[in-house]
């Protein structure tokens, strides 16, 4: 992903404030509520019967933290996202059979959750930079599918 110096500063500046557990759990929870068909990949997580059940589910929160921790790793390797996410791409393609469109949807949920948590700090320019990053990560995760 090519980011200008200003975009990199916006991304890294905001990311330094992010609570990975809180934002990750909320972003994954939002994905499962807004796009309920994605729940089929998480049947082992127990009760996903309502928005409250999803958002309060400890397994959703734990996996959301794991997802955002991995995303954070990608922020350290913006010039090599495909390499950084190669193993995860293979896992999601070959073993889990996740529709790669879901990566884009989750990226959008991450952006929405960041906007929700950081409001005025997450202005249009910061959002534009994060949209580039989540698109790059989604593309890297979908790489094995091509």
UniProtKB/Swiss-Prot annotation:
Heme b binds at residues 63, 92. The modification N6-acetyllysine is found at residues 59, 82, 144. One of its GO terms (cellular component) is haptoglobin-hemoglobin complex. It holds the Pfam family Globin. One of its GO terms (biological process) is hydrogen peroxide catabolic process. GO terms for molecular function: haptoglobin binding; heme binding; hemoglobin alpha binding; metal ion binding; organic acid binding; oxygen binding; oxygen carrier activity; peroxidase activity. The modification Phosphoserine is found at residue 44. It comes from the Eukaryota. Residues 2-146 form the Globin domain. Red blood cells. Heterotetramer of two alpha chains and two beta chains. PANTHER family: HEMOGLOBIN FAMILY MEMBER, HEMOGLOBIN SUBUNIT BETA. Belongs to the globin family. This is Hemoglobin subunit beta. The gene is HBB.
């Amino acid at each position: 992903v090519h980011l200008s110096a200003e975009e990199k500063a916006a991304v890294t500046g905001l990311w330094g404030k992010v609570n990975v557990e809180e934002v990750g759990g909320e972003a994954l929870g939002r994905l499962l509520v807004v796009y309920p068909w994605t729940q089929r990949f998480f049947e082992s997580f127990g009760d996903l019967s309502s928005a409250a059940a999803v958002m309060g589910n400890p397994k959703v929160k734990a996996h959301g933290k794991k997802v955002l921790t991995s995303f954070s790793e990608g922020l350290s390797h913006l010039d090599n996202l495909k390499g950084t996410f190669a193993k995860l791409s293979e896992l999601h393609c070959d073993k889990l059979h996740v529709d790669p469109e879901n990566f884009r949807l989750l990226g959008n949920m991450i952006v929405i959750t960041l906007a929700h948590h950081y409001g005025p700090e997450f202005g249009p320019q910061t959002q534009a930079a994060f949209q580039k990053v989540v698109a790059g990560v989604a593309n890297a995760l979908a790489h094995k599918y091509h």
